[in-house]
Amino acid sequence: MNVLQLLGVNRVINAAGAETPLGGSVLPPEVVDEMREASFIFLDMHELLNKAGKRVAELLGVKAAFITAGAAAGLTISAAACIAGKNIAKIKKLPITDDMKNQIVVQRSHRTVFDHAYMMAGARLIEIGKPFIYNKREIEGTINDKTAAIAFTVTGRGIVSLEEYFEVAKHYGLPLIVDAAPVIPPITYPRDLCKNADLVVVSGGKALRGPNDSGIICGEPDLIEACALNAHPNFAIGRPMKISKEQIVGLVAAVELYVKKDENAEINKWFATLRKISEILDSAPNFEKKIVFPDEINRPVPRLHIRIGRNKVWEVIEKLKSGVPKIFTAEYLTMDYYPDSLVIDPTTLLEGDDEIVADRLLELLKSLGG
């Protein structure tokens, strides 16, 4: 039985990066094998989560870790841990938090579509600053007896350093939560972030190539214990964010594989892919092309930028998606950072995809007068 064929759902070409709407990443065969083995047996989920978290923490070089059903779930559970802690009575009340410390301070330029995940736990977000104007004293001015935590997002926007945030958090005895979903590579980044944070949330389904619906909370052991109490399989706010034994085992296997990977060799491969695409597009000389490195959050990830112009770039993006196979590019980068450019991310291109992308793009660019 071929379910995809039965449903009439065809594969797409992912030149956007490891994005949830496109299925995250492609699982290595070793990860699939481990998940398959786990699917045939029953396990004590408390024991599995506990031991899997310890192993992942060891591999990443952090103090403690907890596995979640994706990074967004990790934000919700982190917020719950900061609000309710290990108090069972409070845990059972979430998301009703009126009688608890329930405010989380966040810089306006760090607001994202994902910060509603904090609110799902009953948090009230207290926004500070203008998007690109910030005074450190603004954080201190918002802290009161209802403040539960401070939140930071690893992003290409904002002018507040993580170190400044952490300094304020420590001074007031508040936990600092970092949304670091896409920060790998390098694999050392979560460990480095934990030096200036109490909880760091990382996606398991992006560069790690674990299941798309997996994530990791790294951080201080006491708070990680609180995360576990507020999460599945307990009857808590995290119960609907259930993570299966297959996901847990698959994520551990993915991390085991990744820490043995030669990141520099992979980066060089990405550069070669982009250079190949760029050379094919030389036949459309009217459009400027450049490989940008590092990326917006300073990861060692190269991307190819093709300057098409604000008036035409979305026309090209939509035509790529309407073809067979559909080709998706890094639309969020066009939308948020580079409004006149189409951006190709090589990290999720499969073998042979580069030529298909280049040929289709060349055809479209020539139709625009390239």
Give the label of every model feature segment:
Residues 45-50, 64-66, 238-242, 261-270, ...:
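Flexible, glycine/charged-enriched surface loops at secondary-structure junctions
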Residues 36-48, 216-217:
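An acidic intrinsically disordered interaction segment
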Residues 1-27, 48-259, 263, 278, ...:
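Conserved PLP-enzyme active-site core in the AAT-like
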Residues 11-21, 29-39, 299-304:
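Generic N-terminal amphipathic, Lys/Arg-enriched alpha-helix
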Residues 37, 51, 55, 269-276:
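A non-catalytic, amphipathic alpha-helix used as a structural packing/dimerization or gating element
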Residues 244-307:
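Active-site pocket-lining segment
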Residues 234-235, 321-328, 363-369:
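A common structural junction motif
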Residues 3, 282-360:
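Conserved C-terminal alpha-helix-loop-beta "cap" of PLP-dependent enzymes
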